[in-house]
Regions:
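A short beta-loop-alpha structural element at the N-terminal edge
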Residues: 1-12
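Short beta->alpha linker loops
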Residues: 7, 56, 100-101
Length: 147
């Protein structure tokens, strides 16, 4: 697992599309904040991705995908865990996500379903919320604040 580079863009977009995940805004995020986009590689082939779109103390977890034949090996769990640790270390206090297929998978990290109206305005204005994901997508959140 390593930070992505713009050279990974084609492979990452292909991976996201193979999972029917939105790619709107992904290239811009990768160019602006490559440190917030992680890739997993196997034999020099991109097999996983996860990204954080950071807006001050809030972040949107997006673009989590793993090659289908490697899905049971914990690659996705490692990608998400690494990004959440990075987020916490950089001062992010809350992470949100949208999903249409994985609402049962994210609670293992502490995410809970939340109301769309509770999403901070800066995240609600992102392309994921306004264009890329359907209004029927499940919204989940995780607090990284230490009590």
């Amino acid at each position: 697992i390593r930070p992505a580079t713009v050279d990974d863009l084609f492979a990452l977009v292909a991976l996201l599309r193979s999972h029917d995940l939105p790619v709107d805004g992904f290239a811009d995020l990768l160019r602006a904040s490559p440190q917030h986009v992680l890739v997993a590689e196997l034999n020099a082939v991109v097999v996983g991705s996860a990204a954080l779109d950071v807006h001050g103390p809030h972040a949107l977890l997006r673009s989590v995908a793993v090659a289908r034949d490697l899905a049971a090996l914990g690659v996705g769990k490692r990608l998400v865990s690494d990004l959440l640790a990075q987020a916490k270390a950089s001062g992010v206090t809350s992470v949100y996500l949208l999903t249409t297929t994985a609402a049962a998978w994210f609670p293992k990290f502490g995410f809970t379903v939340t109301d769309r109206a509770r999403v901070p305005a800066d995240l609600a204005a992102t392309v994921e919320f306004t264009k890329a994901c359907p209004a029927s997508a499940t919204v989940m959140s995780l607090s990284l604040s230490t009590p």
